[in-house]
Amino acid sequence: DVCERSLATLREVGTTNKTHLRDYENAINEETGAILKVHTSNYKILGFTESVSASEIATIKGDLPLIEDLGSGVLINLEDYGLEHEPTVMESVASGVDVVTFSGDKLLGGPQAGIIVGKEKYISQIKKNQLLRALRVDKMTIAALETILNYYIDKNKTFEIPTIKMITESFESIENRAEKLFSMLEGMAGVELNIVETASEVGGGSLPNQFIKSKAIEIDPKNISAAKLEEGLRKLEVPIITRIYKDKILLDLRTIDEEEYEIIANELKGILGER
């Protein structure tokens, strides 16, 4: 939609499920102004598929600028933490891409913003565009983004970023934390509690069809419905977000910090009439 509004002529390359390098070669002509490759960061095509990497396209692009939209914009190798490969910004730049675009939030873990990195030649042209004044982010966003990027520079702090911390926490660590929260909730009237294994989805338009093994506190309310309890928790001044599975509430420990345990215990007691 953005490209169409710019009045650029878009020429699709290949088919939905299979694209070959020759498709790019056949599509390039004297009117081609740039090549855009968009990473499927929020969906996945399964089955009979084939795609062309950015590094392969770089070998045939000539003097044309190669643009890659990564979507999520991850800066660490997620394969080290049991997830499937997700191309990093650094990999994209190293592959020969001239301009890389990605989000400041999502997997990066910062404020909502669009980030553009690339060769000075093209970044300079982008800076001269008159739309820059209308689309640039404010000083608060810049300050928040700078803080997050400094956390990536200091490797000891990278895993303090909430998004990264949640995605990379080990199953064993979550299991231990689940036991602690369970002990604080155990014996609560009007509910049956269990620790169950579950699977977390990253969501937010990132890592489609990838599930991370986790532990959850399963709450089976006896005097109110699971839907009513879920609504009550969600509408608190500090909302507690849960999900319902087989008419039971699940509190996924992957998304809960230890300092939030007491809040959860107190609010549950309040809704169930124990406070």
For each predicted feature, which ranges?
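Conserved PLP-enzyme active-site core in the AAT-like
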Residues: D1-Y152, E186, E267
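Short Gly/Ser/Thr- and Asp/Glu-enriched loop/turn motifs at secondary-structure junctions
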Residues: L108-P111, I212, R243-I249
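C-terminal catalytic subdomain
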Residues: R136-M184
